Structures are given as C-alpha cells and as structure tokens.
A protein has these predicted regions:
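Hydrophobic alpha-helical and helix-loop surface patches within well-folded domains
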Residues: 531, 561-817
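A short, amphipathic edge element
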Residues: 67-93, 107-109, 338-344, 793-802
Length: 876
C-alpha cells in the first residue's frame, strides 16, 4: 500500500513538471539575471547594471549604484539569493542579500526584487531594501598609521595604564578611532572599588590591587572613550616615525591574538571575521604584565555588572562587578530577554555514538516583545557547523556567530511584529563529545586497581561507559540566550540497540532499517524516539545508552526506573523511594511540576547525578570482583552514607533548578542550596533528628574551611576560585542558612514561604530579592540584616558565650551572655541534661551583645552551646 502511494505521488510530481516546464525554465533564468547584476556590480559597469531594471526605476538605481561606490567608497560586491517565488511564467519575486565591501567596511542589504519577463528576459520592475542595513568593519593593525609618542595614559574607573616613549599603531578605519596597539615600557594599576572583589583579589595575589610592568597593550573602544579616557602626548621629534619590520610584525602578532576575542562575529555570507564598533563607553583593554601575564579588562555599560577582569592563562574571571554610580549618572542595560521569548521547539536530531557525530534540525517559534524585531540571539556550540537557516517562507537568513562566546545571531529579512509568533529553522551538524558535568558530582577514582580480599593489588581494565548525556552545557541545539521557558517536541534517532530518554513524555518509538519502519528487532539498524513536553522547561536534555526498563509505578505520578549496561544489580525499592520523596516535597514545596519522573541509573566515572526536567540521572561507580565499590575521596557534599541522599537531592531539583531557576549567577543557591536543604530534610524525616548532628557538623566544618572564598551570592564564580568552595558555600552554607531561617520563622511558616515562592515563580527565573520579598510579605519581618550577613558576606560569626546556673524561686536560672564581633542574626540552640532528660532550647541572637535567662525546674548539667553545629562560625 505504501509503495503504491509513493509511486502515485512520484507520477503526479512528474506530470506536474511536464505540464509546467515554463515555471522550471523561469527559475533557471532568474539565476541568469542575478548573475548579470552581480557581474555589472563587480565590473562597476553602471550601464550594464541598469539594463536589468525597468525604465521607471533606472534613475533611482543609478543614484544607488553611484552612492555605493562614490559616496560610501565600496570597492566590490557579492549577491546571495536567499529565496524566490515564481508567481507565473512571466512574474517572479526574489530576495537577495547584497554584500558590499571595501578595505575596511562592509554593508549588507536585503533586496526584494519584483521581476517581469519581457521579450524572454527578466527585468526588475521594483527593488526595495527590506529590514535594517547592517554595517560591519574589517579592522586591521598595523595600518598606514603609526607613531612614537612621549607618553600614553589610559584611565577608566578602577584601572590605569601608563606608557613612556611608546610606539602606537592605529587601526585602518578612517575618521574615527576604534583600536590601538601600544608597544613599550609601561605599567598598570588596577584596584576594584567593590569590597568583596578586593577581598577576592587579595586571596589570589595577597594584595587587593594589581600592579605590574607592561610590555604592550591592545585596546578596542568607542570614539567617545578614545577622546575622554586616552591621553597621548606626542613627540615632535618623531612625527614621521617609520616602524621597523620587527616592530610591525610584533604589532600584527598582538592584534591577531586579541582581535578575535571581542566585538567580532563570523558572518554567514563570506565566512569572514567582521567587527562591530563599540558603543557609548564600551571598551576592552588587553595587556601583558611581566609577572601577571595576559589579562583583559572589559567595560560594558549594557550589562548588569559593567567591569570584568579576565586572566587568559587559565581562562578565569578574576573580578566582575558594577562600580558605584556617580551622582546623576544613569546606567544603561539592554537585555535580549525583553526583545523576544522562545515559545516552542521542534527538534529532530540523530546521534552516532561511535563517531560522536550529531546532526539536527531545529524549528524555533519565538514571540517578539518589541516592535520591528530584526534579529534573534541564541547559544550554540561552535563545534556544530550550521548548514543553513531559513524563515517561515523557506528563505535563507543571514546570520553571524561569536564562536568565543558560543553565540549565534540570526537576522530577519523583514522585522517581525510585536506579540505575533514567528519561526525559523536551523540545520546543523558536527562532531560533539558530551562535556563532563561539574555540578552535583563527586570525583571518582582515576586509577583502576584495588586491594582485594587477600591483600593483593590487582589492576584491571576500566569498564565501558556506554551512556552519552547531552544537557545544557553541551549547547547541542540553538538554545535561548536568556532564561526562557518553552515547550518542545524532540525526535532523537540513534543506532539500534541504543535507546534514548529525554524530557517529557515518550509518545512514539520506531525501529528503522535505513529509512523504512520495521517491526522485527532483528531487522532494525536504528531507532527513533519522539518526546513531547506538556509543561514548560528551561532547557532540553537527552541521554543515549543501552537501558533496561526495571519497572514503573503509576499509582499517582508515573515513575519509571531504568539502568544502563554495566550495572548488574536492580536496586529494589528505588521506585518506592522516589515516590516517597516526591510526596515529601509536594507537602513542603508544592505540586510536582512535571507529568512524569524517570529515574536513570548509569555506570559512570563519578558519583552524583544530574536532574533535567522530568527525569534524573544517578551515577554509579564500577564494582570490582569482590563486590567492593571504588569510593571517591573527600567531598563537602558527599552524604552517600545515606543511600537516599543522591536521589533525594536530584528529585528536589525538579522544583528548585528546573521549575524555578535562577536569574543570575548571584542566585545559584536557589537551585543547589534549596535542593540540598530538601535532601537533608528528607534524610531527617526518614532517619530522625540524630542525622542532623553528623550532617550539620560536616557542613559547618566545610563552611568554616572555605568561607573565605566568598559569600553565597558569589554563586558559580566560587567554582573559579576553588571547586570545593562552591560546594561548601552554595550547597552546605545555604542549607545551614535556610535551616536557621526555618528556626526563626517556624517550620509551618517557612514551608508556607517556599510554597508561595514556588507558586509565584513556577516556570520562570527568580532572584534572591524575590525570595526575600516573599518571606517578608508572609512573615511580616524585615530580614535584610539576616540575608546580608549569611548570603551577602563571606564572614562568619565569632561569638563568645558564657553561662552560669543559679538557684531561683525553687528552681534554677540558666543565664547566657553573648558577645559577637559582627552583627549576625541567628537562632542559637542550647542543650543540657535536666532530671535525666535531654532538653533543647532556642534563643534568637540579633544584637552584638545580648543576655538571656532561662527558667528551669531542675539543675542543668552537660550544657552545650550550638550542639549540632547548626550555626557555622567560632563559638568560644
């Protein structure tokens, strides 16, 4: 039946072609007229150019032609047909990208041509430029401008560079300044105005400022920045200085190293690296210190935190912050999140594990939030090669890529209308090895040997790890550049017998032999899996492997259990455990945010896990022949002595990290901190309060050890300072702080806050301030001091506590005197034995110096202050 349908369809198309040969001929001839226009522009032959246009528009086109070469100084051009519509045998419409360029600039226009066939030749009746004209530049150093000067001084906010007797190489752009290479003896002084950034600098360099001798500097800047922030004192004796070949080569080498790193994009038409011009006070200053090495100072008034100091030897952000605003100064902040929202994806990918090769097609629906939206911005792995990008009418779109920042810009032919959904399709492919995940993992052993039961060390080959996880960090599809939530339909094709698990519901599974569907597994060469998300997600993930379906529980929420090849034990009870955890969190956080939950256990080189929307991955280490599991070393977050820990932590991420995510890196704790807190509370509920002494003791020790690296609001930047510091602060310190907050508010009120916070921000990004606002609205308390101390500071309490016991009114009075070095707010638990029973009492410390009296019936003994180490810091 299928073959008969295909044959009929082929015959129909063949007849259509035979019956309408004129349309096919018209399409062929359209290419001829475009070629004629191209050749006439290349030869700068205005007469030949005008022959392609009707008499009514020749005068206008002659003016346009001459302006390009005479007024704008263009020297050559290239035309790229982006789409055509043959309306009839004698009428057609064509869209063309026209690229004009000279030695330093590029102009890109999109032409809409309406053509009419006269005397067997196509002629342009109307030509309109649609969309915005794109102007880009080809910056070069060295150019024909160089000079030796007496001094150069660059001063901006918190940085100052000075050079004496320096050699300056200017860029090739006429009538404005945008780039400069300075060679010579100089010095740099950088001192961040932000107190936390000073502290971080001191940790790295033992000083809260940087000072070094320089050998060169590379600058990109706006013309305004050049006039206001760069002072050049010229040397009258060296006005006609001619640099040597060695000096010229050095300038070119410096320029070639730094130029691709900022204000540059690779365009899709001729694949050349083109440059935008810095705007307002934008500036990039690269410099090489004799001791410090190569750094880049970046200032962008269009971002939340304008100043960024970056060290290239280890690709590390040293400082990033916003300087204090000067009086009367207004900050400008531009976000693509305000310009459009991604609403839906339809993605079709195939992955070949043996070759690590991925190919895909992504249809992306967006909703403009501004009038006349002319471009889109996505994140895409630069290892993936873009084949083409088309709009809803199949027309090829112009795009550019910033490979260093993994950013893709797509430009509409015609600007899109506000609130009217539109779509594009992106075709791409390339070799892509899934990157290693760094969050929620604990490093496993690197040497495959163990001391067996008889005391003999045995080495063995590492196992085959046959799972491939593509998640957010892989940027395997054109992802939103902001925190957009969207729905999606994903089709993944893999070689048989590999399988795929992804976000949402599996709605279709097909076995294939080449492109034909088969039913017999023995005939299958590949398998296709189709998933649909019923609820919004913030990113898409899929894992490929050879999985065993170990069962499911569909009593309330569908929960499924899979394990990968290499795992030889089923781990009974995991479905019931997952069910209990979900129920526990629903009571405290709110309804489970997705339609199903898949638990995927895989053999891997690290313990830990990962939690995309609607499924979680639990890593398990290899078991050696005597049943021993190779256990990883110390980690701040390892609570694996309780087997429920990892699954509880990863399931908590379905609420915190997935359904509610963080707005900026300052808010990372909303994901990892709340998930860790939830896991600890589940362990407490299952095993009793006794577990808190061990857990909080460990968390406090690690917090005290790593707190110096920064506050909770430093977020992901802590990883750059010390990976263990990130876990100690974001996971552990946050858990302790949230536990203190629960003690301050009361358990019922605290979980009411979490439920309301989750309800307000479900399927969206939230901030620390959003969390504080929710708490203060529900509790009626001002918690600014609490959050500043525990979330905004790297300091910890230093507390002197003295106590005394006196008889009073037939009983006893326990008196406490508390003195703090800094003002922290915290609940302080005191524990003692009274009449043979353990008693605990909480007092709220909210002043630097405080005294408390506790009335008792019996005499207290074995008095303990902060018994579970629930408050990190020094207690004397």
């Amino acid at each position: 039946m299928k073959n008969r349908l295909i044959s009929s369809l082929f015959l129909f198309l063949l007849l259509a072609f035979i019956l309408h040969p004129a349309l096919h001929s018209a399409e062929q001839n359209l290419n001829d007229v475009i070629l004629r226009i191209q050749n006439s522009i290349t030869q700068k032959d205005v007469t030949a150019y005008l022959e392609n246009f009707s008499d009514e528009i020749k005068a206008v086109e002659e003016l346009n032609f001459n302006d390009k070469f005479d007024l704008f100084g263009m020297e050559r051009a290239a035309l790229f047909k982006t789409g055509e519509t043959v309306l009839s045998e004698n009428e057609a419409e064509v869209y063309i990208h026209a690229l004009f360029q000279n030695s330093y600039s590029v102009i890109i226009e999109t032409w809409h041509l309406s053509l009419l066939k006269l005397d067997d030749l196509w002629q342009v009746q109307e030509k309109n430029i649609v969309g915005n004209i794109t102007s880009l530049y080809m910056v070069q150093i060295p150019s024909n401008r160089a000079e030796r000067v007496e001094s150069v001084e660059i001063e901006h906010e918190d940085i100052k560079l000075s050079f004496k007797n320096a050699l300056l190489f200017y860029d090739n752009i006429p009538e404005l300044e945008t780039a400069l290479v300075i060679i010579g003896k100089g010095d740099v002084h950088f001192s961040p105005s932000d107190s936390i950034e000073k502290h971080l600098l001191k940790l790295s360099y033992k000083k809260d400022f940087l000072k070094d001798e320089l050998t060169y500097a590379y600058l990109r800047f706006s013309d305004q920045f050049f006039r206001n922030n760069i002072k050049i004192v010229k040397n009258s004796d060296d006005i006609d200085y001619q640099p040597t070949q060695k000096e010229t080569s050095e300038a070119h080498s410096i320029f070639s190293r730094h130029y691709p790193r900022s204000f540059t994009v690779e365009n899709s038409l001729n694949k050349e690296l083109l440059s935008t011009l810095p705007q307002s006070d934008e500036a990039v200053i690269g410099f090489k210190g004799k001791k410090l090495g190569i750094f880049t100072y970046i200032y962008s008034p269009f971002t939340n935190e304008e100043i960024n100091l970056y060290r290239w030897k280890d690709k590390k952000i040293i400082n990033i912050y916003s300087p204090d605003s000067k009086e009367g100064e207004k900050r400008l902040f531009l976000s693509f999140a305000r310009m459009f929202e991604v609403k839906n994806y339809q993605i079709d990918v195939s992955f070949e594990p043996e070759k690590s090769f991925l190919s895909g097609k992504a249809k992306i629906e967006v909703e403009p939030k501004v009038d006349s939206l002319d471009r889109l911005k996505f994140k895409l792995n630069p290892k993936l090669h873009i084949l083409r990008i088309t709009d809803e009418e199949g027309r090829a779109l112009f795009y550019s890529q910033d490979r260093l920042r993994e950013t893709l810009y797509v430009y509409f032919i015609r600007p899109s209308t506000k609130n009217k959904t539109c779509s594009i399709e992106i075709y791409y492919r390339g070799k892509l090895v899934p990157p290693e995940l760094v969050a929620d993992v604990i490093a496993g052993p690197q040497v495959y040997s163990w001391k067996g039961r008889f005391g003999v060390y045995i080495k063995f080959l590492p196992p085959d790890y046959e799972t491939y996880l593509f998640s957010r960090s892989a940027i395997w599809y054109p992802a939103p550049s902001e925190n957009d939530y969207f729905r999606a339909r994903l089709k993944v094709t893999v070689p048989f017998p590999f399988q795929c698990i992804s976000n949402g519901e599996l709605i279709e599974e097909t076995l294939l032999r080449d492109t034909e569907e088969v039913e017999d597994r023995a005939d299958a060469k590949s398998a296709a899996f189709v998933f649909e998300t019923k609820h919004p997600v913030k990113y898409l993930s899929f894992i490929v492997g050879k999985f065993t379906n170990a069962g499911e529980d569909t009593e309330s929420l569908p929960i499924r259990h899979f394990y990968s090849s290499g795992i030889d034990f089923m781990r009974r009870g995991i479905l019931q455990e997952a069910k209990n955890i979900v129920r526990f969190y629903e009571e405290r956080f709110g309804p489970y945010p997705y339609g199903k939950l898949s638990v995927v256990r895989r053999l891997w080189i690290t313990t830990g896990g990962h939690s995309p929307a609607s499924f979680i991955i639990l890593n398990e280490l290899f078991q050696v022949q005597d049943g021993t599991v190779l256990v990883p070393g110390r980690s701040p977050v390892d609570l694996s002595r309780w087997k429920e820990y990892f699954i509880a932590h990863e399931i908590a991420h379905q609420w915190w990290g997935q359904a509610v995510t963080w707005k900026t890196y300052h808010d990372h704790w909303l994901s990892e901190g709340l998930a860790q807190f939830g896991a600890v509370q589940y362990l407490r509920q299952k095993h009793g309060d006794e577990v808190l002494e061990t857990i909080f003791g460990k968390f406090s020790r690690w917090t005290e050890k790593k707190s110096k690296w920064g506050p909770i609001i430093l977020g992901g930047r802590l990883t750059l300072q010390d990976p263990l510091a990130y876990q100690a602060i974001i996971y552990n310190k946050t858990t302790l702080a949230l536990n203190m907050l629960m003690d301050l508010l009361g358990e019922e009120s605290f979980y009411q806050v979490l439920k309301e916070f989750f309800r307000r921000h479900k399927y969206s990004a939230a901030s620390t301030q959003d969390f504080i606002q929710t708490i203060e609205e529900i509790s009626g308390k001002n918690l600014d001091v609490f959050f500043q101390g525990w979330f905004g500071s790297y300091s910890l309490p230093e507390v002197n506590v003295s106590h005394s016991v006196k008889k009073a009114n037939g009983g006893y009075t326990l008196s406490l005197k508390i003195d703090q070095r800094e003002a922290f707010i915290f609940p302080l638990w005191i524990e003692w034995i009274e009449n043979g029973e353990k008693v605990k009492k909480m007092v709220i410390v909210d002043e630097v110096n405080e005294e408390f009296e506790i009335k008792l019936e019996g005499k207290p003994t074995k008095i303990k202050i902060n018994p579970n180490s629930a408050v990190p810091g020094k207690f004397h």
